[in-house]
Amino acid sequence: MNILAFDTSTEKFSISILKNNKIVLNLSKILNKTYSKFLISILKKSLEKSNLDIKKINCILISLGPGSFTGIRIGIAAAKGLGIPHKINILGYNNMDILVNSVDKKIKKNVITIIKSKKNDYYFQVFNTKKEPLTKTSFFSIYNLPKLFLIKT
């Protein structure tokens, strides 16, 4: 299985390439550029670096956020632009689900996932011990942090 996965939902760009079920490229970098100016180029260069042709990709995974609406739309457009002409499956994923599933299974307490949005703004979601959501993904400012702890689950 060959998979191209990338995330344009935050200022931290991430890309991973799985080739023959092995991770051959995994990069995360904070970028001070607009995704629309470099995304297709960096995706193509990453495939070249991994010695993988786009036609050999079985699936493209793209982040659906939460995060920058514009960044998410650019990522989806790039995934479609690369995937549709080659009939590649395109799947979206939620960053909160990725985060909660990275928590050690030994932890038997509720988990709050938090993703930075802009300067002092964040997204969060509360999950139970079975990693099921107790709340919807919500937005808060750091200035309202005390109110966050009043949420009933």
What are these regions (language model features)?
Residues 11, 65-66, 117-120:
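Short glycine-rich anion-binding loops that position phosphate/pyrophosphate groups of nucleotides
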Residues 59-95:
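DPxDG-like acidic metal-binding loop motif
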Residues 1-64:
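N-terminal beta-alpha supersecondary unit
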